From Swiss-Prot:
InterPro entries: Trp_synth_b_CS (IPR006653), Trp_synth_beta (IPR006654), Trp_synth_beta/beta-like (IPR023026), TrpB-like_PALP (IPR001926), TrpB-like_PALP_sf (IPR036052). It holds the Pfam family PALP. It catalyses: (1S,2R)-1-C-(indol-3-yl)glycerol 3-phosphate + L-serine = D-glyceraldehyde 3-phosphate + L-tryptophan + H2O. This is Tryptophan synthase beta chain. The keyword Lyase applies. The beta subunit is responsible for the synthesis of L-tryptophan from indole and L-serine. Its cofactor is pyridoxal 5'-phosphate. GO terms for molecular function: tryptophan synthase activity. Tetramer of two alpha and two beta chains. It comes from Verminephrobacter eiseniae (strain EF01-2). Pathway: Amino-acid biosynthesis; L-tryptophan biosynthesis; L-tryptophan from chorismate: step 5/5.
Length: 421
């Protein structure tokens, strides 16, 4: 698919995308488009961005051959793109640096952000501390409770964290409140959106900043495969979890021209795709407008957004980036669901076979890779985008496992077993 050129000048990916915003934000969006058009290919901007990725984030992120997991599962060889090793512990920092650089060039001293799992909020707080910008992070009250370590990290970094009590008190509601803030502080505020969602140019801009993931993989994989005597120069499949979809788009986009590589996005199937308790917008949603763009949305017959569920705060969102909707429509990417329990099992499996604690978001991608590998040959390969580390999720996993996270006196001297045992 060498002719892939998306979006168009108006930000459309086929019938998806575009910009559906209030009149108050029209000028701010226009200014952002102009600024990004000016700097996206500017040598000085790109050099600074690359320098920050190398010296502040620690890129390039390595690719790791999960050899023990591959042997235990059987079938294809599994490789992990280690975004969890980035500074702040996830892929989110890649995009935040690019947008913060734009904010400085546009003269915006105040930054706002939404966050679900807290990783985008931590990344925003981190770069604002580095650049001397005011930072306000909106986070659903439910997510504040289940991701409390990241809340404290944001506060340590100087950010103001605003719990959102409206709606389902999750990522959707945090994004709503951030949009309201932007409307009332449009002159001095830059909104750093964390995913490939929102009005144009955000889906394109976030994708471009995150594409460093896939670009590195294309350079790294030939040597990895040759070292393990695997077939081909690139993986047979690339797998990433999809909520809004920024980590997935970051690894997918550079691979779009590689026809021999399947692109597989993994949505949160929650308690099951037929349960009504999930966040699988592409599999169970329908076209609609959410947060400024047309995409696939979980909505009822009257167009009202329905409640979502996922064990993973970062995937608990009723929409998806418009480019994912387009890639599904044209058949270049496929999207599947993984349940809460399957993600938990994969979380424990990776901990015990590789010594890596993955984020619950990333665990969804790992779970599908483990399933898929069994159907493939040993000389074939799967590349998983391990989008973040799981430190933030240990409390959630401990609660679900019946473990005593704080190891109170009653648990001293006792072994604590995980849910998968």
């Amino acid at each position: 698919m060498t002719s892939y050129r998306q979006p168009d000048a108006a930000g459309h990916f086929g019938p998806y995308g575009g910009s559906f915003v209030s009149e108050t934000l029209t000028l701010a969006i226009a200014q952002l488009r102009t600024a990004y058009a000016r700097y996206q290919n500017d040598p000085e901007f790109l050099a600074e961005f690359g320098d920050e990725l190398k010296h502040f984030v620690g890129r390039p992120a390595p690719i790791y051959h999960a050899a023990r997991s591959s042997r235990e599962i059987g079938g294809a060889q599994i490789y992990l793109k280690r975004e969890d090793l980035n500074h702040t512990g996830a892929h989110k920092i890649n995009n935040v640096i690019g947008q913060a650089m734009l904010a400085r060039r546009m003269g915006k001293p105040r930054v706002i952000a939404e966050t679900g799992a807290g990783q985008h909020g931590v990344a925003a707080a981190t770069i604002c501390a580095r650049y001397g910008l005011e930072c306000v992070v909106y986070m659903g009250a439910h997510d504040v409770r289940r991701q409390s370590p990241n809340v404290y990290r944001m506060k340590l970094l100087g950010a103001t964290v605003v719990p959102v009590e409206s709606g389902s008190r999750t990522l959707k509601d945090a994004l709503n409140e951030a949009m309201r803030d932007w409307v009332t502080h449009v002159d001095d505020t830059f909104y750093i959106i964390g995913s490939v969602a929102g009005p144009h140019p955000y889906p394109m801009m976030v994708r471009d900043f995150q594409s460093i993931i896939g670009k590195e993989c294309i350079e790294q994989m030939p040597a990895m495969l040759a070292r393990n005597m695997a077939a081909g120069q690139q993986p047979d499949a690339v797998i990433a979890c999809v909520g809004g979809g920024s980590n997935a788009m970051g690894i997918f986009h550079p691979y779009i021209p590689f026809a021999g590589t399947r692109l597989i996005g993994v949505e949160a199937a929650g308690l099951g795709l037929e349960s009504g308790q999930h966040s699988a917008s592409l599999q169970k949603g329908s076209p609609g407008v959410l947060h400024g763009s047309r995409t696939f949305v979980l909505q009822d017959a009257n167009g009202q957004i329905t409640e979502t569920h996922s064990i993973s705060a970062g995937l608990d969102y009723p929409g998806v980036g418009p480019e994912h909707a387009w890639l599904q429509q044209i058949g270049r990417a496929e999207y599947v669901g993984i349940t809460d329990q399957e993600a938990l099992d994969a979380f424990h499996f990776l901990c015990r076979t590789e010594g890596i604690i993955p984020a619950l978001e990333s665990s969804h991608a790992v779970a599908h890779a483990l399933k898929l590998a069994k159907t493939m040959r040993p000389d074939q390969s799967i590349l998983v985008n391990l989008s973040g580390r799981g430190d933030k999720d240990i409390g959630t996993v401990a609660d679900l496992s019946g473990a005593d996270f704080y190891c109170r006196p009653s648990c001293h001297g006792q072994s604590v077993k995980g849910a998968s045992q």
